[in-house]
Swiss-Prot record:
Role: Releases the supercoiling and torsional tension of DNA, which is introduced during the DNA replication and transcription, by transiently cleaving and rejoining one strand of the DNA duplex. Introduces a single-strand break via transesterification at a target site in duplex DNA. The scissile phosphodiester is attacked by the catalytic tyrosine of the enzyme, resulting in the formation of a DNA-(5'-phosphotyrosyl)-enzyme intermediate and the expulsion of a 3'-OH DNA strand. The free DNA strand then undergoes passage around the unbroken strand, thus removing DNA supercoils.
Gene that encodes it: topA
The protein's name: DNA topoisomerase 1
Binding site for Mg(2+): E4, D103
Protein origin, superkingdom: Archaea
Residue stretches making up the Topo IA-type catalytic domain: 149-568
Active site annotation, chain numbering: Y311 (o-(5'-phospho-dna)-tyrosine intermediate)
Domain Toprim residue range list: 1-134
Keyword field contains Zinc-finger: yes
Organism expressing this protein natively: Aeropyrum pernix (strain ATCC 700893 / DSM 11879 / JCM 9820 / NBRC 100138 / K1)
Cofactor(s) annotated in UniProt: Mg(2+)
Pfam name, any one: Topoisom_bac
Catalytic activity, EC: 5.6.2.1
Lineage: Archaea, Thermoproteota, Thermoprotei, Desulfurococcales, Desulfurococcaceae
Length: 673
């Protein structure tokens, strides 16, 4: 029996032993376990993830010949795999039956299959399918073993082979372009999913740095009635300038009374959220705990190996009726969230009907707790993610939350209408369990039509619009999900690869590095088809077709080779004309004229200052926006530029650069007007 990792192998062995003797053995320093069940001796042996992968000895590109070989033979960082290889090669031959007990996904299917193919006999092989490592689930999977999941194996092998073909050919092509441009070897990497993700990061980074904020004037009044205080804002109108807003403030100081014209209230229902899939968990852990997506995924996988939660790499938001939820809640009632579990059982009377989300996964249900107790004390981070999963699971069985919203329209002595809003949670419902989504209450004093309220404070301020895009790990993950590239289990790893390669940097807010900018520009120049998600998404769909039996692996690999060949032909056609630009992007070719502000290649000059394409676009955007900015904040253009140059305006870095330079140079200042 082949397990994906040593910890999983141990859990499987002890589950199958029914508490009887488990013999722990070791070969080449790698543990494996022997148990007896139903009169048979079962050897549970672990791998350490993928033991085999595609490789070639061919040089240059295009390269389409490869074979599956032990990864440690060609990857210097995978030397630790050799001891697993030797252990498996020693104990697998000669068994009467082979069982793939790796995780039930396309990666696990390939890991187990390649090991059995290398050291055993795939004609005497079976597949165990389980979603948790809890003892009862392992025993059930053992009793219901099926034939090898050939479609999953073929889909997994196709993905590995396809990603290898794209990665090696495009990376070698990029390095050849860099070698010709720079006159030296430059290590660059690209990939079917990695490349469009990098280009999207570059696009977002440019938009953030080119952002010219819009200014608006906000007026907020604080009013009082019968000892109760509330806030109100303009309704159906807004001050067009700072000067107008200040005038309104002065008027309301002299005549501070407002008449209540309309009072409305309504009750809203907040439906419980479904249990997590991996993407939802990663986004919520980032929002609530500040964890990067890959860290959340790693923690969830460790919780799974501890048998505390179900398999996390799932796209499903559904909890099927086949799971014994009452048994899980009974166990949770004696754990760290026992009070909440007991409360839910009391609330539902034991009738457990979970909310179902729209997304499904044929292999696994939504992430849920098993109710098992940890074998060791959990770290603070592990406990926080575990609590998030348990609370979301409990919320899925709870009733709807009810909130009461009130809206009040008031009129001042000049006839201007103001709107006040209140919110009160009437019934917490599922929010008792998943409090992270509880809306903030805004109390409103009792108000009736005709009542008078007195203005006690008027706040006037300039608000600057934020850039419409973000660049961090969580926002890239959301983008990959929205365009359907990558898988639940690979997206966070691909994003992390962009940081490890030195293309992106920063944690909470990310930046594209000079190397990342160069690679993104080269991909857009030489592989424009690979800079968009369409091509990647099309091949993702083909993988699903293999999994569902609509296509064969060979069909998809042949199509990949054909597409790569066409891309490389276009690449070679474009290469000669792009060599110099690539050298400039890599910083290996000295530019004839450098940007005054950043040293990049200048594309134009304004008032004697040479500017690169980034700063030139920033100049153009700022010039178009400046008159309206000055008018809104009731200032001169110079004062508006001073506001832009300060960080508080939320202007992009390149826009601030141009504004600061214009404030120092009258010629550039006049060019902006």
């Amino acid at each position: 029996m082949v397990a994906e990792k040593p910890k999983a192998a141990a859990k499987i062995a002890y589950a199958l032993s029914d508490g009887r003797g488990v013999l722990r053995c070791s070969e080449y320093g790698v543990p494996y376990w022997i148990v007896r069940r139903d009169g048979a001796a079962i050897v549970v042996a672990p791998s350490a993830g993928h033991l085999f992968g595609p490789h070639t000895d061919s040089r240059g590109f295009p390269v389409f010949d490869f074979e599956w070989r032990p990864i440690f033979e060609f990857d210097r960082g995978a030397g630790y795999l050799s001891k697993f290889y030797r252990m498996l090669s020693r104990i697998l031959p000669g068994a009467s039956l082979y069982v793939n007990a790796c995780d039930y996904d396309i990666e696990g299917s390939v890991i187990g299959f390649k090991i059995i193919e290398a050291f055993g006999d795939v004609n005497r092989a079976r597949r165990m399918k389980f979603s948790t490592l809890a003892p009862q689930d392992i025993r059930r999977a053992y009793a219901r073993m099926e034939r090898l999941d050939v479609e999953m194996i073929e889909a997994g092998m196709a993905r590995s082979e396809m990603d290898w073909l794209w990665g090696i050919n495009v990376s070698r092509a990029l390095m050849e372009a860099a070698r010709r441009a720079a006159g030296r070897r430059v290590i660059l990497s690209a990939g079917r999913v990695q490349s469009p993700t990098l280009v999207e990061a570059y696009r977002r980074w440019r938009e953030i740095n080119l952002h010219v904020p819009k200014a608006s004037v906000a007026v907020k009044i604080t009013a009082e009635k019968g000892g109760g205080v509330f806030d109100a804002r303009p309704h159906g109108w807004k001050p067009q300038s700072l000067e107008t807003a200040r005038s309104i403030k002065s008027e309301l100081r002299k005549n501070p009374w407002l008449a209540v014209e309309e009072v409305r209230s309504e009750r809203s229902i907040l439906r419980p959220p479904p249990a997590f899939n991996l993407g939802d968990l990663q986004k919520e852990a980032n929002r609530i705990l500040g964890l990067p997506p890959l860290r959340t995924q790693s923690i969830a996988e460790e919780l799974y190996l501890e048998a505390l939660i179900s398999y996390p790499r799932t796209n499903s938001q559904k909890l099927p009726p086949s799971i014994n939820y009452r048994a899980i809640l009974d166990k949770l009632a004696h754990g760290p969230l026992g009070r909440e579990a007991r409360e839910l059982l009391k609330e539902t009377g034991g009738v457990l009907r979970p909310v179902q989300g729209s997304k499904d996964d044929p292999a696994h249900p939504a992430i849920h707790p098993t109710g098992e107790k940890p074998s060791q004390r959990l770290s603070k981070e592990h406990m926080a993610v575990y609590e998030l999963i348990v609370r979301r699971f409990l919320a899925a069985f709870s009733r709807e939350a009810i909130v009461s919203k009130s809206s009040v329209l008031l009129r001042d002595f000049q006839g201007r209408v103001w709107r006040a809003e209140g919110l009160r949670v009437e019934d917490l419902g599922w929010l008792k369990y998943y409090h992270y989504s509880t809306p903030g209450e805004k109390p409103m004093p009792p108000l009736d039509r005709g009542d008078k309220a007195r203005v006690v404070r008027v706040d006037v301020r300039v608000e600057w619009s934020q850039t419409p895009v973000r660049l961090d790990k969580a926002s890239l993950l959301r983008w990959m999900e929205s365009v359907n590239i990558g898988t639940e289990g690979t997206r966070a790893r691909i994003i992390e690869t962009l940081y490890k390669r030195g293309y992106l940097e920063g944690s909470r807010k990310s930046e594209v590095t000079p190397l990342g900018e160069a690679v993104a520009v080269i991909i857009q120049t030489l592989f424009p088809e690979l800079s968009k998600p369409d091509l990647t998404r099309r091949f993702e769909s083909m993988i699903e077709d293999i999994r569902s039996g609509r296509r064969t692996r060979q069909e998809v690999i042949d199509m990949s080779k054909k597409t790569i060949s066409k891309l490389l032909e276009s690449f070679l056609d474009r290469l000669d004309t792009a060599v110099r630009e690539i050298g400039v992007s890599l910083g290996s070719v000295e530019v004839e004229a450098a940007c005054h502000l950043c040293g990049r290649k200048a594309v134009s000059a304004v008032s004697g200052y040479r500017l690169c394409s980034h700063h030139m676009e920033a100049f153009d955007r700022l010039r178009k926006a400046l008159p309206n900015l000055a008018s809104t904040i009731s200032s001169t253009p110079r004062e508006a530029l001073e506001a832009i140059a300060r960080g508080r305006s939320r202007a992009g870095a390149w826009v601030r650069d141009v504004a600061a330079l214009a404030l120092r140079d009258d010629g550039l200042y006049k060019a902006l007007l």
